[in-house]
UniProtKB/Swiss-Prot annotation:
Residue stretches in coiled coil: none
One Pfam family recorded for the sequence: RrnaAD
GO annotations of cellular component type: cytosol
EC number from the UniProt entry: 2.1.1.182
Entry protein name: Ribosomal RNA small subunit methyltransferase A
GO molecular function ontology, one term from the record: 16S rRNA (adenine(1518)-N(6)/adenine(1519)-N(6))-dimethyltransferase activity
Main location (coarse class): cytoplasm
The species this protein was found in: Wolbachia pipientis subsp. Culex pipiens (strain wPip)
Disulfide bond entries: none
UniProt cross-references to NCBIfam families, sorted A to Z: ksgA
Length: 264
């Protein structure tokens, strides 16, 4: 990496993986890539990119916002003509289905500053993907995988687990990155479900969970007042007393609540 005179940009949440062993572990978790199109976010100088290409995917699309890094992929582009493309773009604004066809897998060391927003974007179109192997800050990974009655359980947990099977695979120490972040990172695997675990309007569920978890220490009868004018009927139809706090509700209970709420 020194030969490239690495100057990671904090504004873009750049932290490059130093360990080839970790890179190999990440790509291996995605399984066979032979018949799949693959999307990579923030390829940086191409360490993860090279390992993905070694698995001989049908096609690899890398999305890089930093124009100064795109030029470092010329050799890979020449070596894998017709099977590799890198575009300069903000991943939050990319419409993946316009660039690659199914089946699609995602493998990415996500930039810290857009990881949650990007994952939520993908959840809204989750059936497009076969699986996703993603690195987050450990704190974010724990929010995604959290169970009810835990401090990390929230809107992100509910939405993620409603739509996917998710597993936290392993943690990575700060020393394995350049520059060294202040926090641990975690790799998770995401397998979209054929259908959501429970029938629900996702927009309503999102608004509901965000509203009540913004007041997570309040009982539901109080936190629901911000989004519905008929709290009593909503609770009765959802078979809830109102004494519950948001963190105690299961995903099924949240879906039942969302299906019975009349939004303001």
């Amino acid at each position: 990496m020194r030969k490239f005179l690495l100057k990671p940009k904090k504004s873009l949440g750049q932290n490059f993986i130093l360990s080839n062993e970790i890179i190999k572990r990440i790509v291996a978790l995605a399984g066979s890539l032979k018949d799949f199109n693959v999307i990579e976010i923030g390829p940086g100088y191409g360490a993860l990119t090279r390992e993905i290409l070694a698995y001989n995917p049908k096609f690899l699309l890398s999305i890089e916002k930093d124009s100064s890094l795109v030029k470092h992929h010329e050799q890979l582009l020449n070596e894998h003509q017709g099977k590799y493309r890198i575009i300069e773009a903000d991943a939050l604004n990319v419409v993946e289905k316009e660039l690659v066809e199914c089946p699609v897998k995602v493998i990415a060391n996500l930039p810290y500053n857009i990881s949650v927003a990007l994952f939520l974007k993908w959840l809204n179109n989750i059936k497009f993907f076969t699986n996703l192997t993603l690195m987050f800050q450990k704190e974010v990974a724990e929010r995604i995988t959290a169970e009810p009655n835990s401090k990390d359980y929230g809107s992100l947990s509910v939405l993620s687990q409603l739509l996917c099977d998710i597993k936290k695979e392993f943690d990575i120490e700060p020393k394995e990155f350049f520059p060294r972040p202040k926090v641990y990172s975690s790799v998770i695997t995401v397998k979209p479900l054929p259908t959501p675990r429970f029938a629900v309007n996702l927009e309503t569920l999102t608004k509901l969970t965000r509203a009540v978890f913004a007041q997570r220490r309040k009982m539901l009868r109080n936190s629901l007042q911000s989004i519905t004018s008929d709290v009593s009927t909503t609770l009765e139809n959802a078979k809830l007393s109102g004494d519950e706090r948001p963190e105690s509700l299961t995903i099924e209970q949240f879906c039942l609540l969302a299906n019975n709420i009349i939004m303001r």
